[in-house]
């Protein structure tokens, strides 16, 4: 995600990466536009009220994500992956549009070639994430997708990968499966058990 100010045209150009790896939030009030890679930065402004967006909360509790760029705070929105925002300083308005959309097409490749390509692209993707300016970790559920990512990640790093598994204290937890993968890949593994009490106690700090 990035922002560019065009001095000649007096326009601000914001864009978020195609897959939404990096976040970008914005808020428009009285013709002014505030933006940041973190919501907490926008909340530091005195004119911003910390009001809960109940519609977004309902979406999150139903789908585990919010829709149409809404966040859990009223009047603060998320620029969606592959979107750009152009703000005009002269008339103090902005427009949002898509600069990229996923182009799906049918492939005639053989199964073996598809597997070969998949491995290549997965390794390339993981390598890009290793260039992060923050410590790299992985959520490990014990399922096929996260186990595959952790296995590949472990082969590409010198230090043990930090992995995390969450559970809720019942028989459906995937601690056992995740531990098997962790032991096999020699990761620095952490198990986190969530409970209703822990979640309700943490809610005031989250909000």
Q: What do these predicted ranges mean?
A:
Residues 1, 71-74, 126-127:
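Generic recognition of flexible, low-complexity loop/linker segments
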Residues 2, 85, 182:
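Residue-level signal for inorganic ion chemistry
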Residues 5-109:
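N-terminal segments that mediate ammonia production and transfer
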Residues 7-33, 48, 89, 103-207:
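ATP-dependent adenylate-handling active sites, centered on carboxylate activation for C-N bond formation
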